[in-house]
């Protein structure tokens, strides 16, 4: 039960930080603060659904692969905008079942350069910067990360993928999730 309270506290600590004014921020950070404030106050609402993680078969034994949960069910909420250049920027908070079927909370910011293919179809490439917490890494102490992010979208739906790098026996996971703009 303690892990659930930690996850809730983790997300609640992020919300007030994004809603505060940027006037007191140092000049070098003010632009980022203003963008986060814009996303939070003007952005559309997003529903995130997670569902699949693929562990690179070349990096794990077949016994280890069988022990992993690759159905990373979960979900979350977010806010996002298409900025003045047509690029996507968003804030999100999700929780899903990790490779060991433990709940993994994650909250962060994503950016993608968007290429349009027709009026309703788009492709994106960018990155996400986040905080997460895992039972098998630092005993659930939240830690930061940055990962590549690719997407394909049609109208209000977008499918995302990222690859978590690693070495032999850790990491090397393709993680896929979806976003519905509403």
Curated annotation (Swiss-Prot):
Knockout or disruption consequences: Disruption of this gene suppresses the esterified palmitate chain (16:0) in the lipid A and compromises the ability to persist in a mouse after 7 days. However, the mutant is no different from wild-type in its ability to colonize and persist within the respiratory tract during the early part of the infection.
Official protein name in the record: Lipid A acyltransferase PagP
Signal peptide feature range: 1-21
NCBIfam families attached to this UniProt entry: PRK11045.1 (NF008271)
Site keyed Role in lipopolysaccharide recognition: positions: 64
Annotated compartments: Cell outer membrane
Designated gene of the protein: pagP
GO biological process: lipid A biosynthetic process
Tree of life domain: Bacteria
Membrane topology according to the record: Lipid-anchor
Lipid-acceptor residues (N-palmitoyl cysteine): 22
Active-site residues, as the UniProt record annotates them: 55, 98, 99
One term of GO molecular function: O-palmitoyltransferase activity
Induction profile: The expression of pagP is down-regulated in Bvg-minus phase and up-regulated in Bvg-plus phase.
Enzyme class: transferase
Residues carrying lipid (S-diacylglycerol cysteine): 22
UniProt keyword annotations, A-Z: Acyltransferase, Cell outer membrane, Lipoprotein, Membrane, Palmitate, Signal, Transferase
Cellular component terms (Gene Ontology): cell outer membrane
Matching InterPro entries: LipidA_acyl_PagP, OMP/PagP_b-brl
Record text on subunit structure and interactions: Homodimer.
Function: Transfers a fatty acid residue from the sn-1 position of a phospholipid to the N-linked hydroxyfatty acid chain on the proximal unit of lipid A or its precursors. Required for resistance to cationic antimicrobial peptides (CAMPs). Modifications of lipid A with an acyl chain to evade host immune defenses by resisting antibody-mediated complement lysis during respiratory infection.
Protein family (similarity comment): Belongs to the lipid A palmitoyltransferase family.
Assigned EC number: 2.3.1.251
């Amino acid at each position: 039960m303690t892990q659930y309270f930690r996850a809730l506290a983790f997300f609640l600590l992020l919300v007030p930080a994004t809603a505060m004014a940027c006037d007191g921020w140092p000049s070098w950070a003010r632009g980022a603060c203003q963008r986060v404030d814009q996303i939070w106050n003007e952005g559309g609402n997003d529903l995130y659904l997670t569902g699949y993680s693929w562990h690179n078969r070349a990096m794990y034994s077949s016994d280890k692969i069988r022990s992993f949960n690759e159905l990373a069910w979960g979900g979350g909420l977010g806010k996002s905008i298409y900025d003045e250049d047509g690029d996507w920027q968003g804030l999100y908070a999700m929780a899903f079942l990790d490779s060991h079927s433990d709940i993994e909370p994650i909250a962060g910011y994503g950016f993608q350069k968007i290429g349009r293919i027709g009026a309703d179809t788009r492709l994106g490439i960018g990155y996400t910067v986040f905080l997460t917490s895992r039972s098998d890494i630092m005993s659930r102490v939240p830690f930061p990360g940055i990962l590549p992010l690719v997407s394909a979208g049609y109208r209000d739906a977008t499918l995302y993928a990222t690859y978590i790098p690693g070495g032999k026996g850790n990491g090397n996971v393709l993680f896929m999730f979806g976003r519905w703009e509403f």
